[in-house]
Amino acid sequence: MQHPAEHSPLGKTSEYVSSYTPSLLFPISRTAKWAELGLSAETLPYRGVDIWNCYELSWLTPAGKPVVAIGEFSIPADSPNIIESKSFKLYLNSLNQSAFDSREALRAVLQKDLSAAVGAPVGVRLRSLDEVAEEGIGRLPGRCIDELDIAVDGYEQPRPELLRCDAGRIVEEQLYSHLLKSNCPVTGQPDWGTLVVDYRGPALDPASLLAYLVSFRQHQDFHEQCVERIFLDLQRLLQPQALSVYARYVRRGGLDINPYRSLAEVAPDNRRLVRQ
């Protein structure tokens, strides 16, 4: 079956437009991917957000002087659509030679266009470089599982059957791995990321979690769907009292994508990690 992104700019030669062009945004419905996971808009078992950070954001003042900022865009996890990443980049590049009366005027335009594209209200922040620099590089709490010894014999498809837990021992902990990798479903390009699991419930075997995450290595899907699949597989296994799954992906084309799915309505930390 043809992937819905096949008609997007992904994998194609594109003209870079330098004047404001909102029509460049290419929405992709979440419905088909939800259906693959047995979900619908009415039955989502999680809350969450997709945080996009843009490091190549620039526009002009009315006097023609360039301005730069770092953009932070928060797309609700239950929005009808996502935005294809290359089209997002092309849209943001179209601002480069466009004049706006103020930073707030641009923020309002971005919020209007992005909300229209995804079909839900999008949070938009335009942050100064000094503000972001003061935050520094984020360090994850919890336990890194990357040094555990595991044997791996398959990389093509996620393997939830690898996951194990101790139903007789209830814990509250955070586990993370920097070894998450999947591939773009259209171009095959690698997507590198860090995956954080925060939960309260039956003790998850960390080696089994690592083996499971490595099984995504040749899997082709968008960032958002990978995180949703991981969330659902862990929820089915653990039946936890609390669960959140957060991926911090390495940037491409000046954008990084950070999907967060949780049983609770909690705003995730958006400080960038060392590879971002």
Swiss-Prot record:
Keyword terms of this UniProt record: Cytoplasm, NADP, Oxidoreductase, Queuosine biosynthesis
Any one biological process term the GO annotation gives: queuosine biosynthetic process
Residues where NADPH binds: S85, K86, R252, G253
Name of the top EC class for this enzyme: oxidoreductase
This enzyme's EC code(s): 1.7.1.13
Residues given in the record as substrate binding sites: I83, E84, S85, H223, E224
Recorded GO CC terms: cytosol
Gene3D superfamilies hit by this protein: 3.30.1130.10
Catalytic activities: 7-aminomethyl-7-carbaguanine + 2 NADP(+) = 7-cyano-7-deazaguanine + 2 NADPH + 3 H(+)
Assigned protein family: Belongs to the GTP cyclohydrolase I family. QueF type 2 subfamily.
Matching PANTHER family: NADPH-DEPENDENT 7-CYANO-7-DEAZAGUANINE REDUCTASE
Protein name: NADPH-dependent 7-cyano-7-deazaguanine reductase
Taxonomic source organism: Pseudomonas aeruginosa (strain ATCC 15692 / DSM 22644 / CIP 104116 / JCM 14847 / LMG 12228 / 1C / PRS 101 / PAO1)
